[in-house]
Amino acid sequence: ELVELGLFEEFSLGRRKYLRSNDGHEVIWQKAKAYLRTPVKFEIWTHSPVFLRASEICLAGISALSKLTMVNADQETCYALSPAQWRENQTNITVLPEKEPGATCYQILAYESRLQRSKDANSSRTSCVDALSLWLSFRDNGDSRIELALSDLEKEFRW
């Protein structure tokens, strides 16, 4: 797919096949953006408890963005659930038809997100979804404060 999209070209050395690009990381990133999609399959709101091990708790959405940038968090917390975590918990969750005060948001992701530790020294035990997944989940948001935070987040991507 990477070759078909024009991001890389394939070449062979002996029996091995390799990919190469004459473009730098930034150019590849700019070209690839159009083909990337959000990892969030769907989002639910609930008052029901979701039982996860401490190592599995992962902030998502605006909660994660507020830990990694200067944007303010909402009062309600948002967490990420992998497909497996969702399957394990969904029978015990009463999903609300819409966001309610005091409810918790869960974003069900298409894949298991790599955890990223928050830079906030006061919450060193807080894990967030990886920066790329977070960026993708907000990229078409349209809110100017979110766009500014995404720009800051994008500058920190390590290639």
Predicted regions and their residues:
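A broad, low-amplitude sensor of folded, mature protein cores
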Residues: E1-E4, W135
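Basic, amphipathic "hinge/linker" alpha-helix immediately C-terminal to the N-terminal HTH DNA-binding motif
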Residues: D23-I28
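Internal, well-ordered alpha-helical scaffold/interface segments
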Residues: E4, W29-Q30
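A short, conserved structural fragment
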Residues: V3-G14
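Long, low-complexity, charge-rich intrinsically disordered regions
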Residues: Q30-W159
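Minor-groove-contacting beta-hairpin "wing" of winged helix-turn-helix DNA-binding domains
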Residues: R15-N22
